[in-house]
Amino acid sequence: MKISANSIRTGNILVYNNDLWVVSKQPEHTQPGKGGAYVQVEMKNLKTGTKRNERFSSSDHLEKAELEQKDYQFLYFEDNNIVLMDNQTFEQISVNKEILDEKLPFLTENMIVKVEFYNEKPLSIELPATVILEIIETDPVIKGATATASYKPATLANGVKVKVPQYLEIGEKIVVKTEDLTYVERSK
């Protein structure tokens, strides 16, 4: 699907020079005093990971990749891959672990994830917005430390370290955002 350069947004996946590029930063729309308006776009190649700044005229049209999104259930790890199952067809697919990068520790058994496909090839895996995890290591509670909003480091059951409020103890379950690895609330 063709979109105008003015319609490009962060997160869009574009087909440019026969490669897939994700827009990594909000495009800058510029209208100089002399000459035509243009859009400065910072994008990252999905295959190689290289970043590139490109300038497009406001009148340019680019190909936006049409992605298909499906829900899959995480089953298990196999060598360097993640094995997922489509809950409608029970078809299993194997995807390289690198697709998740630093979010890999948040993947838990039977978790439902969204997989984005381009030309029937998996491009990305989107985890749920939040996960519930147990604190396995943190400093003890200090009496009177709840007067100010201060945070202390805590290690979660998956090995990830996050900052949590002073009043939380080892063994408590908390809700964590998978997007930026931040504490949300105590689990209910």
From Swiss-Prot:
The GO terms this record gives for MF are:
translation elongation factor activity
- What is its pathway? Protein biosynthesis; polypeptide chain elongation
**What's an example GO cellular component term for this entry?**
cytoplasm
What keywords appear on the UniProt entry?
Cytoplasm, Elongation factor, Protein biosynthesis
Pfam families hit by this protein: EFP (PF01132), EFP_N (PF08207), Elong-fact-P_C (PF09285)
What are its GO biological-process terms? peptide biosynthetic process
Q: Main localization of the protein?
A: cytoplasm
Superkingdom, natural source: Bacteria
* InterPro entries, per database record: Elong-fact-P_C, NA-bd_OB-fold, Rib_uL2_dom2, Transl_elong_fac_P/YeiP, Transl_elong_KOW-like, Transl_elong_P/YeiP_cen, Transl_elong_P/YeiP_CS, Transl_elongation_fac_P
**In which compartments does the protein localize?**
Cytoplasm
Q: Which CDD domains match?
A: S1_EF-P_repeat_1 (cd04470)
Q: So what family is this one in?
A: Belongs to the elongation factor P family.
HAMAP family with a match to the protein in the record: EF_P (MF_00141)
Instruction: Say what the protein does.
Output: Involved in peptide bond synthesis. Stimulates efficient translation and peptide-bond synthesis on native or reconstituted 70S ribosomes in vitro. Probably functions indirectly by altering the affinity of the ribosome for aminoacyl-tRNA, thus increasing their reactivity as acceptors for peptidyl transferase.
Q: What is this protein called?
A: Elongation factor P
The organism's lineage is: Bacteria, Pseudomonadati, Pseudomonadota, Alphaproteobacteria, Rickettsiales
